[in-house]
Regions:
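Short beta-strands within extracellular/lumenal beta-sheet-rich domains
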Residues: 71-85
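Short, surface-exposed tryptophan/glycine-enriched loops
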Residues: 126-158
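N-terminal leader/pro-regions and domain N-caps
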Residues: 24-68
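Internal, hydrophobic beta-strand segments that form the core of beta-sheet-rich folds
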Residues: 154-171
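Proprotein-processing/basic-patch segments
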Residues: 168-194
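A short beta-strand element within beta-rich, extracytoplasmic domains
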Residues: 88-102
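C-terminal segment of classical bacterial N-terminal signal peptides
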Residues: 16-24
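Short, surface-exposed beta-strand/strand-loop-strand elements in extracellular ectodomains
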Residues: 104-121
């Protein structure tokens, strides 16, 4: 190969490389979700919420979502969201973090939850209610649910809802959250192009 051929080859590769690099960078960019303020009721409160770096994950920090000595407390959370145009919600992962104290000889504690979607941006929940029973103490438990959304809609606004309750038996305790207020519930959305 002579110097002229090498120069032409180098020029062609440089031009092609310059065109491919921005294209590759643009295709790797992830779509982001806009989250509204999380609202909780009747017997819990949202202390804070944090959007993850991927803009598809929302961490919700609670206050007073606990039950002890035979109590049952419920917490209903609603979050308005905007799904970007050209995308639909495919799957979701919801991670609960908490602690429970279950002395030997007691009936234990439980965490129950179900999910609802309001509006076309999410479609229909394809998941049944879940209950996790704890029969021993655990300073930091993690329970993760994976749910599928069946949406024909492409982008738009919607509301994601969690209906959760914690149940204790006499002499037991359960809380969603931890003393250092690390994230209690993390909600992650997987999106698909439509």
């Amino acid at each position: 190969m002579n110097f002229k051929q090498f120069g032409v080859l180098l020029s062609v590769s440089t031009v092609l490389g310059m065109n491919l690099i921005p294209t590759k960078a643009l295709t790797q960019e992830e779509a982001s979700i806009k989250f509204g303020q999380a609202i909780a009721s009747p017997r819990c409160a949202v202390v804070d919420q944090l959007v993850g770096e991927d803009a598809r994950t929302l961490s919700v920090l609670f206050d007073n979502f606990e039950a002890k000595d035979g109590e049952r407390k419920s917490c209903n959370v609603r979050v308005n969201t905007t799904i970007p145009s050209g995308y639909r919600v495919k799957d979701m992962r919801i991670l609960y973090q908490g602690s429970t104290e279950v002395p030997s000889g007691t009936k234990g504690t439980s965490l129950s939850r179900s999910y609802i979607f309001n509006s076309g941006a999410f479609g229909i929940v394809k998941d049944s209610p879940k209950t996790t029973k704890f029969t021993s103490s655990n300073e930091l438990f993690q329970e993760q649910d994976e749910i599928t959304a069946a949406s024909a809609s492409c982008g738009g606004e919607g509301q994601f809802g969690i209906n959760a309750s914690v149940q204790s038996s006499p002499e037991t305790y359960i809380a969603i959250g931890s003393p250092d207020f690390t994230s209690e519930v993390k909600i992650h959305f997987d999106l698909a192009r439509c």
